[in-house]
Amino acid sequence: MKLNELYNNIGAKKNKKRIARGIGSGKGKTGGRGIKGQKSRSGVAIKGFEGGQTPMIKRLPKRGFNCISTKKYNIINIYNIEEALADGRLSAADTITKEKLVEVGVVNNKNNKKLVKLLSICSDDFASPLSLKLDAYSSKAKDLIEKAGGKLL
């Protein structure tokens, strides 16, 4: 037996049916799409149509609303500021503002549209006396900063 004498078993590989290639092929002329109509045309898919049964979007109830005046916050934690201080990206002597945090990469805030809120998750001790000027603070974050001798502007 040689490599050029290897063949697939009979029936192991079957050519797929070529549709719409003449009436002699068995799937010619309309190519299994029926005659005329929207669904026989190319590029047509009726979105949300489930074959006549009531579609899912109609079966589920309407719920809630989107409040226009909701404030959207970028959340940062005290440990994010601690890391930036340790890296040297921020200095404890300066007032830390939203713009400064965006500049050093602590906050990703395109066009300064979102507000910045400081939380104290995973931080029970904070030693640096900082002066911060952000949009909002959690009560625990306020306590930690004021206990360390910092100021909230």
From Swiss-Prot:
**What Gene Ontology cellular-component terms does the record carry?**
large ribosomal subunit
Instruction: Name the SUPFAM superfamilies on file.
Output: Ribosomal proteins L15p and L18e (SSF52080)
- Please cite one Gene Ontology biological process associated with this protein: translation
Database matches in InterPro entries = Ribosomal_uL15, Ribosomal_uL15/eL18, Ribosomal_uL15/eL18_sf, Ribosomal_uL15_bac-type
Region Disordered: start-end pairs: 21-41
Q: Which family does it belong to?
A: Belongs to the universal ribosomal protein uL15 family.
Protein's name according to its UniProt entry: Large ribosomal subunit protein uL15
The organism encoding this protein is: Rickettsia felis (strain ATCC VR-1525 / URRWXCal2)
> Gene name on record?
rplO
